């Protein structure tokens, strides 16, 4: 853990930060083995490097999806994005106001999803307990559409995802309506959910469909069929990746 901080941060601030880091390490069974602390002219910079190992036969990559595999996601999607929209709205509303607190009542779940995401270690443990080995997997950080297209490109496949099966929390739906945003777009392209996207052989359908916290949302197809979203009324739309790409050049 390497940290650069300015004079406006107190020793107590650093104690609180490391208390949170230690709590996360305990939760995920991780040891802090080193780091560096230095001064910064402005602001705060935190750089964390994580190193681990795994049995070779248990490592799952992006490139293993096969035709007819089932596409699965953990948790629900779009909540982190709506949490961000909520925070940005309150920032604008309260700009210049003093002694006024933002009203987040009833929206705590959305804020938690944006501000305190958690790695889905529990899903990995459930899959292992059920003896299910995914054929491909990655986390959903840049949006479901973007990650699906990554898996399909790496695996040389296409996919079909069904709108009616995409898991969305009630609070996410309410906020999308309040912001006049398309709910499916929020779920497909919002990003920062940090849920797991993975594929499993169709032979595991019965086992995975009964697992709490996992939703079957589609299947893998031949590459020539491309990647598409099937809407509730049966229309087919090509998937568009609108997720963040740090290597893309601005035009």
What role is predicted for each listed range?
Residues 17, 44-47, 64-67, 73, ...:
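Internal, well-ordered alpha-helical segments in soluble enzyme and binding-protein domains
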Residues 1-3:
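Short beta-strands and strand-loop turn motifs
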Residues 8-33, 38-46, 51, 129, ...:
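Glycine-/charge-enriched secondary-structure boundary and capping motifs
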Residues 101-148:
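Polyanion-binding loop/helix "lid" in catalytic or ligand-binding cores
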Residues 59, 83, 123, 147, ...:
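Hydrophobic side chains in well-ordered alpha-helices
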Residues 22, 35-39, 56-64, 74, ...:
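A generic local secondary-structure boundary/capping motif
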Residues 25, 55, 75-81, 88-91, ...:
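Short, well-ordered alpha-helical segments in soluble proteins
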Residues 56-115:
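Phosphate/diphosphate-binding glycine-rich loops and adjacent basic-rich segments that engage nucleotide
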């Amino acid at each position: 853990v390497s940290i650069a901080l300015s004079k406006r941060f107190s020793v107590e601030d650093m104690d609180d930060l490391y208390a949170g880091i230690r709590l996360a390490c305990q939760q995920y069974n991780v040891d802090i083995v080193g780091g560096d602390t230095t001064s910064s002219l402005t602001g705060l910079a935190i750089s964390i490097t994580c190193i681990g190992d795994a049995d070779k036969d248990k490592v799952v990559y992006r490139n293993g999806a096969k035709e007819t595999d089932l596409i699965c996601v953990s948790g629900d999607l779009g909540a982190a994005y709506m949490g961000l929209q909520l925070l940005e709205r309150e920032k604008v509303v309260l700009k210049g106001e003093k002694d006024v607190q933002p009203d987040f009542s009833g929206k705590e779940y959305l804020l938690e999803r944006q501000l305190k995401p958690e790695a889905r270690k529990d899903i990995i443990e459930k899959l292992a307990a059920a003896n299910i080995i995914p054929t491909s997997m990655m986390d959903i950080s840049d949006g479901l559409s973007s990650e699906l297209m990554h898996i399909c490109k790496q695996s040389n496949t296409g996919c079909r995802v069904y709108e009616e099966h995409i898991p969305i929390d009630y609070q996410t739906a309410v906020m999308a309506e309040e912001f006049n945003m398309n709910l499916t777009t929020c779920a497909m392209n919002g990003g920062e959910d940090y849920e797991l996207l993975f594929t499993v052989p169709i032979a595991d359908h019965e086992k995975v469909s009964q697992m709490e916290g996992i939703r079957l949302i589609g299947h893998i197809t031949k590459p020539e069929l491309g990647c598409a979203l099937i809407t509730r009324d049966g229309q087919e739309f090509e998937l568009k990746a609108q997720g963040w790409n740090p290597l893309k050049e601005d035009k």
